[in-house]
Every structure is written in structure tokens, then in C-alpha cells.
């Protein structure tokens, strides 16, 4: 009971922040509410790769930055639209909602976003608010196969991933450069928006995911942190985090569609 009261207090605090957050949207508040229930849950990597055969894994007790966002989004969509959370999760995580081996999972966030937009789950609000773009040049997975359990001994999977990278590496995407992110946030960024943090690491587009959360007059990051080993709300502002992460270049901002 005490834990539930603490979560409610934190949610209400986040919703009553500085005016820079602007008017909040119901869908965003639902996302934030669901995300806050994960506070303190342990960060565990590779929870989707416990089996040799690809299958839908639902582990709400151990998350990484991506599965944390996926679970919260799936739970929120199930609440507002009806239906099973697992059905939404499969359509969020896999290309066209079909599980067909390791490479059917949406490993690159560029494709994850594209899939979510096509399914009507999310909208990319970055382009409406930022003219800055980055060209898509994806190659990291195929050039680092030993870093992935299902690639290091599978030339077939590496070839499939290369095909995915080639198809995705056209055009560009809009992002908000880190220099334009203030401690107080921006009026068009709302509580519960999904943050996809972009990177200068060759062959990658995004290196971290989380949620926007206004608190104490600052825009913060609610995320599954590998360094803290759990889901946390950043102590400093989101903008401050960029000063300590030299590989972070900016952010794509997504919003759930109710």
C-alpha cells in the first residue's frame, strides 16, 4: 500500500511541474503512470535471447532500455484500445507482427519507429518541431556479429541483417540536437513521450530509450539504466545527461496514439 501511495505521489508531482511542460495529454499521462510502476525493477540485458528459437518473451520483472519501453507502450495501448497486451507487444517488437526467427525482430530503432508509425501506435513528433536531420547509415550489427549470440555463429542471420541494414540506410530522420535541449525542457515535449537517444557511433542510429518526465522544474529521463542496474528517474536534467555521454548526439521524440 505504501509503495502504491509513493507511486501516486510521484505521478502527481511529475504532472504539476514547471509551465515549460505545457498542457499534458491523457495518453502521455497514462504512459508515464505505467512507466513509473517499473521504478526499481532490475536492469537485465538479453532477456529476449534466453531461447535458441525466437519467441515472444514477456518478462515484466527484468528489463533493459528497449524492453522497458516496449512493455509500457504495449500495456498502455491495451488499456486505451482494448485487447491483449501480448498482441500489441508482438506487433511492436516484430516486423509486421510476425515472429520468423531472430532477424524478424526490430533490432534497429529506425525500423522499430517506422513499424510503430505504420501500425498507428506512435507518431514521430520530432519532424514537426525540429528541422535538423541525420542520414541513416546502419551497419553495426553485421560488422560486429560476435557481439550478438544469434549472429556470431550464423552467417545466414548476418546476411539477413545486412539486407535489413541496406534497406533502412536510405534517406534520413529528424532529431533534436543536444545543444537545443534545455534543462527545463520544451513546450512540445510532454510527460510520457518516448525518447530515442541518437548517437555518433558508426553504424548505429540510436543507443538508448526512455520516457520524458518533468519534475522539480526540469525535464528528466525515466529509463532502465545499465549503470544504476535498475529503472530510475535521472537525478539531473535530461540535458545534463548529454554532458556526461559523449556518444549521445540528440533525441527523437515519439508519442503514443490513443
Regions found by a protein language model. Give the residues of each.
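Sequence/structural signature of beta-propeller domains
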Residues: 28-39
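Low-complexity, Gly/Ser/Thr/Pro-rich intrinsically disordered linker/tail segments
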Residues: 171, 188-196, 206-207, 213, ...
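Bacterial N-terminal signal peptides
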Residues: 9-18
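Short alpha-helix capping/helix-loop boundary micro-motifs
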Residues: 174-185, 199
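Boundary at the C-terminal end of the N-terminal hydrophobic targeting segment
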Residues: 21-23
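Acidic/His-rich structured neighborhood in mature extracellular/periplasmic domains
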Residues: 46-170, 190, 214, 223-226
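Short, charged beta-turn/beta-strand-edge "cap" motif at the junction between a beta-strand
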Residues: 201-204
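Positively charged n-region of N-terminal signal peptides that target proteins for export
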Residues: 1-7
